[in-house]
Amino acid sequence: MTLKNRYKESIRPKLLKELGLKNIHQVPKVVKVNVNRGLGEAASNSKALEASLNEMATITGQKALVTRAKKAIAGFKIREGMPIGCTVTLRGDRMYSFLERFINLALPRIRDFRGVNPKSFDGRGNYTVGVKEQLIFPEISFDKIDSIRGMDITIVTSARSDQEGKALLQELGMPFSKN
C-alpha cells in the first residue's frame, strides 16, 4: 500500500478522531515538500551546480530549479543574478513517493541516527529537516559524487498548529527522537 493510500484509508480517519475534528477536510495533510540546497561554491564552480542539479533530479525524480542571488553581497563575492543554489517543489504522487523513500530508506541510513528533532516545527505545522550528506539516498552512489553536500527538506502541511503537524508526521512514520 502506498503512503497516499495509507493516508486516505487509515491515517485520515484516525487523525479525525484523535484531533476531535468534525469534518474530514479539516484533517491536516501534506501540501508539498520543498528540497533545497544552497551552493556557495556555485558562484566560482559551475560544475558544482551542474552536479547538484543532476543529484537533485535523481533524488526527487523532478528537474531542479536554479535559485539566483536577489542582490549583490560583496562579502560573499556574489553579484545579483548569480546562481547560488537549487530547489525542487514536489506535490501529488511524486511528493508521497519521495516522502515514503525519505522516511523508510534515507533516514535510517544516517550515521548514528536516533530520530529527527521534534522541535524543528515552524509554529504553523510545517517541518524542516537538514540532511548533512546526499549519500543517505540509495539513488546516489559514492563513486559518482564529486563532494559531499547537504540539503534542507521542508514538509509543508495544512495543519494549523505544531501539535497537529507532529501528529500527522508521526502517523506517516516520521521517526521523532524522544528528547
From Swiss-Prot:
Keywords: Ribonucleoprotein, Ribosomal protein, RNA-binding, rRNA-binding, tRNA-binding
Keyword Glycoprotein: no
Record GO terms (molecular function): rRNA binding; structural constituent of ribosome; tRNA binding
A biological process from GO: translation
Domain of life assignment: Bacteria
UniProt GO cellular component terms: ribonucleoprotein complex; ribosome
Pfam families per UniProt: Ribosomal_L5 (PF00281), Ribosomal_L5_C (PF00673)
InterPro entries, A to Z: Ribosomal_uL5, Ribosomal_uL5_bac-type, Ribosomal_uL5_C, Ribosomal_uL5_CS, Ribosomal_uL5_dom_sf, Ribosomal_uL5_N
Iron-sulfur keyword on record: no
PROSITE patterns given in the database record: RIBOSOMAL_L5 (PS00358)
Function of the protein: This is one of the proteins that bind and probably mediate the attachment of the 5S RNA into the large ribosomal subunit, where it forms part of the central protuberance. In the 70S ribosome it contacts protein S13 of the 30S subunit (bridge B1b), connecting the 2 subunits; this bridge is implicated in subunit movement. Contacts the P site tRNA; the 5S rRNA and some of its associated proteins might help stabilize positioning of ribosome-bound tRNAs.
NCBIfam families named among the record's database cross-references: PRK00010.1 (NF000585)
Subunit structure: Part of the 50S ribosomal subunit; part of the 5S rRNA/L5/L18/L25 subcomplex. Contacts the 5S rRNA and the P site tRNA. Forms a bridge to the 30S subunit in the 70S ribosome.
Stated family: Belongs to the universal ribosomal protein uL5 family.
Official protein name in the record: Large ribosomal subunit protein uL5
Species in which this protein is naturally found: Prochlorococcus marinus (strain MIT 9215)
Organismal lineage: Bacteria, Bacillati, Cyanobacteriota, Cyanophyceae, Synechococcales
